[in-house]
C-alpha cells in the first residue's frame, strides 16, 4: 500500500503529510475517507460515523481526522504536549477484521515507524466513555516507551450491544507526529514540511488559539449561559426524537430525526465539559450530568436502529 508523495510531505517532515499518509493507507484498504464532524466533540468517537454507525448489522469502514476539545486539558499554551484542542485520527471497521493488529502495524510502517526497528508494545487498557454509554476491550500501543495510539473492540455503544463487534483505531496525531519528527514540543512540529521562510509550525497555526481558549475555558465562559444551553440541548434532543418517532400506523416503523437529535446530544456533552472546566459542577452533580448525556446518547442509538442506515429493512 505504498503511494508516492512529495518529499516535503513525508510524515517525518510534515504534520499534514502524516495525515495524508494515513488517509492514503486506509483508503487503499477500502475505507470511506470522511471529513471531520462540524461540531465541538471531546473525541473522534463522538463523530456519528463511529457512535451511530458502530450500531446495527451493516458493514461500515471509515477513517477521518477529528478535531477534539477537552477544555480541562488546556494549559495556556505553556505545556509542550498537553492541549485543550488537538487532533485524533479515527478508523472504524465493522465487522472487526481478524487482522486488525496487523493492519495497524502496517499503518505505522507507512508513516515511518518500522515495527522491526522499534519497541512496539500493546498494553491492555479497556476503553470506556461514560457519556456515550460505550465500552470495549482495548489496548494502548506504546512505541519505545510512549503511548501513540489505541485500538478497541467495541462491545457496547449508546448502551446497546454491538453486533457485529466493530474495531476502532485512534491515533493521537500530535503525539505520533512528535515521535516521527523527533521533537519534544508540540508547537515545534513542522506543519507543512517546508524550511526557512516557508516553514509553518504547529505553533504558528494553533498557539494563539490555545492560549485564548484556555482563558475562555477556565476564566471567561459564561456559566449561567452554559447551564441554559445544556437544558436547551437536552430538551431539543428529546423533542427531535419524539418528532421523528414512527407513527403507530406507519407501514415501516422508521425514525426520521436521528442525526439532528444526536447533534443536540453532542452539544450537551460539550457544554458539560465547559461547565466542568469552569469548576461549577460538584462531584455529585457531575455524575448526574454524565447520566443525562448518556440517556440522550442511548435514546439516539435506539432511534438509529430504526433507520435504514441502522439496519432496518426498507
From Swiss-Prot:
Assembly and binders: Tetramer of two alpha and two beta subunits.
Entry annotated with the keyword ATP-binding: yes
Keyword list, A-Z: Aminoacyl-tRNA synthetase, ATP-binding, Cytoplasm, Ligase, Nucleotide-binding, Protein biosynthesis
UniProt lineage: Bacteria, Pseudomonadati, Pseudomonadota, Alphaproteobacteria, Hyphomicrobiales
InterPro entries, per database record: aa-tRNA-synth_II/BPL/LPL, Gly-tRNA-synth_heterodimer, Gly-tRNA_ligase_asu
Name of protein: Glycine--tRNA ligase alpha subunit
Subcellular location: Cytoplasm
Pfam families from the UniProt entry: tRNA-synt_2e
EC number from the UniProt entry: 6.1.1.14
Keyword NADP: no
GO MF annotation, one: ATP binding
Main location: cytoplasm
Gene Ontology biological process terms in this record: glycyl-tRNA aminoacylation
Family assignment from sequence similarity: Belongs to the class-II aminoacyl-tRNA synthetase family.
Amino acid at each position: 500500500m505504498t503511494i508516492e508523495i512529495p518529499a516535503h510531505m513525508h510524515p517525518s517532515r510534515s504534520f499534514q503529510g502524516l495525515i495524508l499518509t494515513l488517509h492514503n493507507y486506509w483508503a487503499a484498504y477500502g475505507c470511506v475517507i470522511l471529513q471531520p464532524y462540524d461540531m465541538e466533540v471531546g473525541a473522534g468517537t463522538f463523530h456519528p460515523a463511529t457512535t451511530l454507525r458502530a450500531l446495527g448489522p451493516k458493514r461500515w469502514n471509515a477513517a477521518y481526522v477529528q478535531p477534539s476539545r477537552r477544555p480541562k486539558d488546556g494549559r495556556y499554551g505553556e505545556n509542550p504536549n498537553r492541549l485543550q484542542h488537538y487532533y485524533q485520527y479515527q478508523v472504524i471497521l465493522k465487522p472487526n477484521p481478524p487482522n486488525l493488529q496487523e493492519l495497524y502495524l502496517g499503518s505505522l510502517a507507512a508513516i515511518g515507524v518500522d515495527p522491526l526497528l522499534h519497541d512496539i508494545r500493546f498494553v491492555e487498557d479497556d476503553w470506556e466513555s461514560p457519556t456515550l454509554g460505550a465500552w470495549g476491550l482495548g489496548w494502548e500501543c506504546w512505541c519505545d516507551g510512549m503511548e501513540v495510539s489505541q485500538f478497541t473492540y467495541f462491545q457496547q455503544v449508546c448502551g446497546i450491544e454491538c453486533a457485529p463487534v466493530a474495531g476502532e483505531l485512534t491515533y493521537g496525531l500530535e503525539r505520533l507526529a512528535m515521535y516521527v519528527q523527533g521533537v519534544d514540543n508540540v508547537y515545534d512540529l513542522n506543519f507543512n514540511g517546508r524550511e526557512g521562510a516557508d516553514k509553518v509550525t504547529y505553533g504558528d497555526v494553533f498557539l494563539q488559539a490555545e492560549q485564548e481558549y484556555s482563558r475562555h475555558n477556565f476564566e471567561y465562559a459564561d456559566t449561567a449561559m452554559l447551564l441554559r444551553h445544556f437544558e436547551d440541548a437536552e430538551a431539543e434532543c428529546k423533542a427531535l426524537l419524539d418528532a421523528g418517532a414512527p407513527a403507530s400506523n406507519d407501514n415501516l416503523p422508521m425514525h426520521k430525526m436521528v442525526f439532528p437529535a444526536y447533534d443536540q446530544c453532542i452539544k450537551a456533552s460539550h457544554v458539560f465539559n465547559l461547565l466542568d472546566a469552569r469548576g461549577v459542577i460538584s462531584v455529585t452533580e457531575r455524575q448526574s450530568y454524565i447520566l443525562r448525556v448518556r440517556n440522550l446518547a442511548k435514546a439516539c442509538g435506539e432511534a438509529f436502529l430504526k433507520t435504514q442506515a441502522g439496519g432496518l429493512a426498507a
